[in-house]
């Protein structure tokens, strides 16, 4: 079970990349979206997100306990789920995918209120939820821009 949690939490090892593993994972999700995932119906896309969130919460709880850290740097399933949500219903052009990526990474790294506070939720739920809130910030901001331009 620990091996499954480790592979899930680290997105099959992407989390072990020495430089910016969260950014690498987000970039990988952008490429998956750009070339494949945008074709999914929105209910199925959201179902995948919910499944990834629940699986990530479970795996992150086990993995963080095994690493004896609250939020191990190598646990990047939260970035995968967050980036997936930030891309929801976005037209898969390079400019919009890149904008979603930059906004999500900004909010995930800077963690303005209330994102930082959400991290304090227990175990894997806190690991996952701050990225979901960062994704909501990114998605809302990008969609507001698109509505107002």
Positions of predicted regions on the chain:
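Interhelical loop and helix-boundary elements at the membrane-water interface
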Residues: 1-25, 58-86, 106-136
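Hydrophobic alpha-helical transmembrane segments
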Residues: 24-28, 43-50, 94, 98-102, ...
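Interfacial segments of multi-pass membrane proteins
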Residues: 28-41, 84-90, 142
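Alpha-helical transmembrane segments and their cytosolic membrane-interface
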Residues: 14-21, 42-45, 143
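Membrane interface segments of multi-pass transport proteins and intramembrane proteases
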Residues: 36-50, 114-125
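Alpha-helical transmembrane segments and their juxtamembrane interface "caps"
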Residues: 38, 42-56, 61, 73-77, ...
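Short alpha-helix boundary/capping motifs
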Residues: 36, 91-92, 113, 146
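Juxtamembrane boundary at the C-terminal end of a transmembrane helix
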Residues: 143-149
């Amino acid at each position: 079970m620990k091996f499954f949690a480790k592979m899930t939490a680290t997105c099959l090892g992407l989390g072990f990349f020495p430089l910016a593993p969260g950014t690498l994972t987000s970039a990988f999700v952008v490429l998956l979206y750009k070339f494949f995932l945008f074709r999914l119906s929105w209910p199925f896309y959201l179902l995948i997100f919910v499944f990834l969130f629940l699986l990530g919460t479970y795996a992150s709880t086990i993995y963080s306990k095994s690493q004896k850290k609250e939020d191990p740097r190598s646990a990047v399933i939260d970035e995968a789920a967050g980036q997936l949500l930030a891309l929801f219903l976005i037209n898969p052009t390079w400019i919009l995918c890149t904008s979603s990526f930059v906004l999500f990474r900004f909010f995930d790294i800077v963690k303005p209120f209330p994102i930082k506070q959400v991290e304090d939720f227990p175990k894997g739920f806190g690991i996952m939820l701050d990225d979901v809130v960062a994704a909501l910030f990114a998605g809302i901001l990008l969609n507001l821009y698109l509505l107002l331009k």
